[in-house]
Amino acid sequence: MAVQPSPLGGFFHHHNRRQPMPLHSLMTRRTWLGAAALAAAACTGTAAFAQAYPNKPIKIVVPFAAGGATDVLARVLAEKMTVGLGQPMVIDNKPGAAGIIGTDAVAKAAPDGYTLLLGLSNSMLTNQFLYTKLPYSPERDIAPVYQIAIAPLVLVAHPSVPVSNGPELLKYIAANKGKVAYGSYGTGAYPHLAGAYMSQSQNADMSHVAYRGEAPMVQDLLGGQIQIGFASALQVKAHIEAGKLKAIGVSGERRMGTLPNVPTLAEQGLNDEAYRVAGWLAFGAPAGTPPAILERLATEVRKATEQPDVAQRIAAMGFDVQKSSPALFAAAMVKERPVWERLIKASGATLD
């Protein structure tokens, strides 16, 4: 591409008489023109690449086994996005190590828009604080594409606990030091971290009971073996409506669509950021993927999640659909990062 003469060229004339250009000025001008030409070529090449994208199938890496909730949603989104992108989207399940294996594969893939990650907040954010030898850096190696949905949890209590809201619960556990037990279903997951933080902040010395899954934890809540716990709406909504569990409040920034009458803990005055964060589901890409391609992908994800059948599927999983973009998702991660780091360090949780 021909480079037009620089307007700065006029400054090298003295009156109407042309003077020899000093060597350093000549080199500066040539360097500037060369840089401008390279930048223009790079921009043109990137723009052309983005306009031609995609011209082959796109792989979505799901770092979990086939048949799980994340995998099912990935296939639903892939079907919808294929229409808008005009190319097949192929699911590639790479389970193992709490999402690390699949996420690492994406982190090391070519940043060309043909390999995507559909992951959870653990592999894309919190694992870096739980593992000392994580093979990738979420911030350095994964580019945010779109935060699909968040998964706030419900803080529930056994009916024998004489409280009905967050502030009352904090007073109760402080007044009954060492007498209250909370449950969780995964070291380093939010129910564990939030319970540990609540206990420490109130000097309550609550007992932590770890379960191999959410269902057995809820069963012990129903039986009164433990008194409180954070759980998904899917697991506890029916028990709340039947009066078998008390809904104390919801984590996250806003009320859950499936439990609209249960206020957030923040609404109740528990303003610590520890009660405002929640797990999430999102798309990522290898760092270095051209911004225009990230925006194109984000647009197609948004279109897919706005379709009623997809939105209903996400809600059925206990997630709340988000309106997102690469910039909004990146900002959310920057905001949440220190909160999760603080919670994990306070709990002492490690996974390696």
Each model region followed by its residue ranges:
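Aromatic (phenylalanine/tyrosine) cluster motif
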Residues: 11-12, 49
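An extracytoplasmic/periplasmic, membrane-proximal ligand-sensing/linker region
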Residues: 9, 17-18, 22, 55-57, ...
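Hinge/capping helix and adjacent helix->loop/strand transition within the periplasmic-binding protein
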Residues: 108-114, 129-216, 265, 270, ...
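N-terminal signal peptide c-region/cleavage motif recognized by signal peptidases
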Residues: 45-47
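N-terminal export leaders
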Residues: 28-33
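N-terminal (or domain-start) structured segment
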Residues: 49-140, 179, 187, 203-232, ...
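Short beta-strand->loop
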Residues: 137-147, 205-209, 227, 237-276, ...
